[in-house]
């Protein structure tokens, strides 16, 4: 890895590199997916929160269907032509006190279905549970490190915690 490229992927974002790179993400109940072409040694990462975009929604990379479609297009544009040469990994989908559990499970189910339909092999999964994850993905080798931790920011548990954080903040300000 001569250039030592790296970036942190936020929820709703997609990143890829045709040069060797480290792609990182921190997730609570979101789901992080990596897809890599084994022959070309290129890959990308998405960080999704919702299983699919509804007709009334503007499609964004927060949604599994949109984000994976975008990542597949990028890989195709970079020369990856066969799903047989691609491999995938799925991480995240944790929950605290059940918050976001169903949504995270729906995301994982949708991701698995898309990979099954496209005949892309899932080589690794680390999903569910009550801990968040910090993920580092090497696009060149496909190696991934996933650290389970309770020490992530509250905002990494969004969108469920967004409401609770706002409520706590208001209650705190009212006591002042």
Regions from the PLM with identified roles:
Residues 106-176:
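Divalent-metal-activated hydrolytic enzyme cores
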Residues 95-106:
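Phosphate/ribose-phosphate-bearing ligand recognition and processing surfaces
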Residues 20-81:
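Conserved mixed alpha/beta catalytic, RNA-binding, or beta-rich assembly cores of soluble enzyme
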Residues 6-11, 18, 30-31, 136-143, ...:
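Cofactor- and metal-binding active-site motifs of prokaryotic enzymes
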Residues 78-86, 121-127:
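Flexible, glycine/charged-enriched surface loops at secondary-structure junctions
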């Amino acid at each position: 890895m001569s250039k030592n490229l790296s970036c942190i992927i936020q929820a709703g974002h997609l990143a890829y590199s045709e040069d060797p790179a480290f792609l990182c993400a921190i997730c609570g109940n979101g789901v992080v997916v990596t897809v890599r072409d084994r022959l070309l040694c290129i890959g990308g990462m998405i960080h999704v929160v919702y299983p699919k975009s509804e007709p009334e929604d503007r499609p964004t990379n927060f949604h599994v269907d949109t984000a994976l479609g975008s990542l597949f297009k990028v890989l195709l544009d970079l020369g990856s032509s066969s799903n047989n040469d691609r491999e995938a990994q799925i991480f995240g989908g944790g929950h605290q006190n059940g918050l976001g559990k169903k949504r995270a499970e729906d995301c994982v189910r949708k991701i698995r279905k898309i990979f099954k339909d496209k005949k892309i092999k899932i080589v690794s999964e680390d999903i569910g549970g009550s801990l968040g994850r910090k993920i580092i993905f090497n696009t060149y080798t496909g190696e991934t490190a996933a650290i389970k931790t309770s020490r992530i920011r509250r905002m990494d548990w969004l969108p469920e915690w967004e409401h609770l954080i706002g409520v706590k903040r208001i209650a705190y300000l009212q006591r002042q």
